[in-house]
Swiss-Prot record:
Name of protein: Plant intracellular Ras-group-related LRR protein 8
Summary of the tissues where the protein is detected: Widely expressed except flowers.
Gene Ontology cellular-component terms listed: mitochondrion
Coiled coil residues, start to end: none
Keyword Glycoprotein: no
Pfam families with a match to the protein in the record: LRR_1 (PF00560), LRR_8 (PF13855)
SUPFAM superfamilies attached to this UniProt entry: L domain-like (SSF52058)
Keywords carried by this UniProt record: Leucine-rich repeat, Repeat
Gene for this chain: PIRL8
Record's function text: Leucine-rich repeat protein that likely mediates protein interactions, possibly in the context of signal transduction.
Motif (GVYW): 291-298
Entry-linked PANTHER family: LEUCINE-RICH REPEAT-CONTAINING PROTEIN, PTHR48051
Assigned protein family: Belongs to the SHOC2 family.
Organism: Arabidopsis thaliana
């Protein structure tokens, strides 16, 4: 299992990959950095005329990083042939709509460390885009059209001024494996984030988050969750944090959390849990300082005691889900599919959408759907 440092290192190769990556024949031009003389890129009105032969070549990788560019004019380039574009570390204030709309084969775009306040709506035309880095700009929002970049695997929007993310981002970007939005002004994450079922890393530290989505258990591949340093804004964690079956690292340090959810005792794969800098009451400091295993045992025992004391109607949500996931077992309880209906949306609450039964709020990944026969959700048409 990869640790956060390893995964972070893996991600850092994206920028380097844009310069020297050679795979499946995508790069068929010499790997040398483009200069003002080899590309007609205009910087503050100063332009250099390229040779006619250079104008007609089909460039696959275009690196214009660190050239102090303030604007772009790439009329001499066959933009449709570009697969990787690096415009990082410049002074670019605006990306032309027409420029982006022409780069239909682009799969890696690096715009970090510029002066961007907005991204063009035409970014939604980049249907093959897999890596997008817009960190270190002045973005206050991401265009809704980014939801059309359905091939996107990594989105880095760190160090901006984002106050919100597109509402449906989680419903559309189903291939996203890393979402990094640290050092922004986010007050909340949209509920749709809970349906990024391919997500492995979620980094939302250094924001102003006051809460997290309730249905985090849908993130079955999530390995790293970092919501540290939201300070006094984040005071509670949802119970579903303890239902993240693949979670390896959880960092909730330096927040205003007083009580950790008992469900943390069910995190079987957890290897690193950071809770320092919180005014914790439960678990007490004496338990926390004993380390991860002691904390997990304490939370697990506390959850069991709470379950025994709680009236039946109030037990169903948490324990019902834990049993379904195989994270908990109780005497006299079956873990089979026929085991009651506690903790799940009633079938009557579902409606047909293109032949698939979904709840009214479009739950794309409900545990009941996973563990029930397909026939329960794929019904023959009614006439």
């Amino acid at each position: 299992m990869m640790g956060y440092e390893q995964m972070n290192q893996m991600t850092m190769t994206t920028t380097a990959m844009m310069k020297n990556y050679n795979k499946k024949g995508l790069i068929n031009t010499p790997q040398k950095k483009m200069t003002r003389r080899s590309v007609s890129a205009i910087d503050g009105g100063a332009a250099a005329t390229a040779k006619e032969g250079d104008r007609r070549q089909n460039i696959k990788t275009l690196d214009l990083s660190g050239m102090s560019l303030a604007s772009l004019s790439a009329s001499s380039i066959n933009l449709a042939s570009i697969s990787k574009l690096d415009l990082s570390n410049n002074n670019i204030q605006k990306i032309p709509e027409s420029l982006v709309a022409r780069m239909l084969n682009l799969w890696a775009l690096d715009l970090q460390s510029n002066q961007l306040k907005t991204l063009p709506n035409s970014i939604g035309c980049l249907s093959k885009l897999k890596f997008l880095n817009v960190s270190g700009n002045y973005l206050q929002s991401l265009p809704k059209t980014i939801e059309d970049c359905r091939s996107l695997e990594e989105l880095n929007a760190n160090f901006n001024e984002l106050t919100r993310l597109p509402d449906a981002i989680g419903f559309e970007l189903t291939n996203l494996t890393k979402l990094s939005v640290n050092s922004n002004k986010l007050v909340l994450l949209p509920n749709s984030v809970s349906y990024l079922t391919s997500l492995r890393v979620l980094d939302a530290r250094l924001n102003r988050l006051s809460s997290l989505p309730e249905d985090l258990e849908n993130l079955v591949n999530l390995q790293v969750l970092n919501v540290s340093q939201n300070f006094q804004h984040l005071t509670t964690l949802p119970y579903s944090v303890g239902l993240l079956i693949s979670l390896v690292e959880l960092d909730v340090s330096y927040n205003g959390i007083t009580v950790l959810p008992d469900s943390l005792g069910c995190l079987r794969r957890i290897q690193k849990l950071s809770v320092e800098g919180n005014p914790l009451i439960s678990p007490p400091f004496e338990v926390v300082e004993q380390g991860l295993e002691a904390l997990k045992q304490y939370m697990s025992e506390k959850m069991t005691e709470s379950y025994k004391k709680t009236p039946t109607k109030k037990k169903s949500w948490g324990i019902g889900k834990l049993v379904k996931y195989g994270l908990s077992s109780s005497p006299g309880r079956s873990t089979g599919r026929e085991d009651g209906k506690e903790g799940f949306i009633n079938v009557s609450d579902y409606r047909q959408i293109d032949g698939i039964a979904s709840p009214r709020h479009v739950s794309l990944f409900n545990p009941r759907r996973l563990l029930s026969p397909l026939s329960a959700y794929f019904s023959p048409p009614r006439y």
